[in-house]
Amino acid sequence: MVPSPAMVTTVAVSICSLTAAVIDLRTRRVPNGLTGAAAAIGVAMALTRTGRVGIVGAVLGAVVGLTLMLPGYLWGATGGGDVKLLAAVGTFLGPDRVLIAFFGMAIGGGLLALATAVVRRRFFNQTFAYAPAIAIGALFAVFK
């Protein structure tokens, strides 16, 4: 039995985003090799499909993901790896579903920030790994 494109996308996004989340929690970095490989796989998968997540959809998904995360990077709220991770996820999801992932990420990030603040008993001037929030949003988008 050949897996459906949706199943392959779900597995690929899950592996990519959860791996990035674990690495970010451990090292506070999202490796370029991971985001680059994920984006390359997303584009390669898109070349085999048409429609919403064909090659045009993959490129638009990356551009939308990058555009949504860029202000946070420019303001110093997120790291470059976080920006590249959402862009890579966008190659799998396309522009419409990466937008859903972004909103899921914002909600997940808010909850993670609150939990981090409560655990640390510090509510201001703190940082935390953001790839787990991106993973929450990406998983929300693929399982929605």
Which positions does each model-derived feature cover?
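A membrane-topology feature that recognizes alpha-helical transmembrane segments
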Residues: 1-144
